[in-house]
Regions:
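Extreme N-terminal starter segment of soluble prokaryotic enzymes
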Residues: 1-4
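Short acidic low-complexity segments
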Residues: 48-61
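Rossmann-fold NAD(P)-binding glycine/threonine-rich loop
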Residues: 79, 84, 92-112
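Rossmann-fold dehydrogenase core element
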Residues: 101-120, 135-139
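N-terminal Rossmann-fold NAD(P) dinucleotide-binding loop
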Residues: 12-13
């Protein structure tokens, strides 16, 4: 099968390289990026580099499309691919919140919208718990100041993250609000809400913590199954916002698409 990759940042590059090295059950013949000049050295390092084209070109030449380009591109990718019966793997999960129209479009054309676990763990447990009923769900994200710089919520509220000397709560609300205020930082909260009790009932807290150098996510859920709690400390990549686990999760997710033995809910 041919995988089209839109976005050649940390995630896109990792997936393309894995395919080039024969680690995936996909070939990548086409990719798109807003900054082709920034990926020339990367493409030259590959044995079989994908052809750079635009969104339409990627969709036309691929069986499945992987979005790694930011929430602002998700709708356009879905509307181009889903009517052709082509499934879309979405990393910018926040862009799918309250987009029942895109889910309906996929259903109409017998395509799928797929969400890798990304930088979070425990989604299998949440999905299982949700089948029986979850009474409450909370998520707390701690990030070092560089990871939060430039976020719309930080800019609009004139929050000086560099001035903080201790862990400080800078946001409390729902995943829906969090993804609008921190579109490049907390896509994990959208994934957690999809797996659990939804974006309106899930409680979200974001903390700026100058004492850490990792992105830390903690999730707690309570229901008839009992109580679950999980925590992950992600090592950031060079762009500070994306954890290494995010691209590793994408690679494993793609492997699972043709795996004989599949583990997890």
């Amino acid at each position: 099968m041919d995988l089209g990759v839109i976005g050649l940042g940390v995630i896109g590059k990792a997936v393309v390289r894995a395919a080039d090295e024969g680690e995936l059950p996909f070939t990548v013949s086409a990719a798109a990026t807003r900054t082709p000049g920034n990926v020339r050295d990367f493409l030259n390092s590959l044995k079989n580099a994908p052809r750079l084209t635009d969104l339409a070109g990627v969709v036309a030449s691929s069986d499945v499309i992987l979005e790694a380009s930011g929430g602002h591109t998700v709708e356009a990718i879905c509307r181009a691919a889903l009517p052709l019966g082509k499934s879309v793997i979405v990393n910018s999960v926040g862009a799918l919140l309250e987009r029942e129209d895109l889910i309906a479009l996929a259903e109409k054309h017998k395509a799928r919208i797929m969400i890798p676990s990304g930088a979070i763990i425990g989604l299998d447990g949440l999905k299982g718990a949700a089948a029986g009923g979850i009474a409450s769900g909370t998520m707390t994200t701690r990030k070092p100041p560089p990871s939060l710089k430039g976020a719309p919520f930080v800019e609009e509220n004139n929050i000086d993250v560099d001035a903080m000397t201790e862990a400080t709560v800078i946001f409390e609300g729902s995943p829906l609000e969090a993804c609008k205020g921190f579109p490049a930082n907390v896509n994990v909260s959208a994934a957690v809400s999809f797996a659990g009790i939804g974006p309106h009932r899930t409680e979200m807290r974001i903390m700026c913590d100058p004492t850490i150098n990792r992105n830390i996510h903690e999730v707690e859920a309570v229901g008839e199954f009992g109580r679950l709690f999980f925590r992950i400390e992600n090592v950031p990549t060079e762009n500070h916002r994306t954890g290494i686990l995010t691209y590793l999760s994408n690679i494993q997710f793609l492997r699972q698409q043709t795996a004989t033995l599949v583990v997890g809910t």
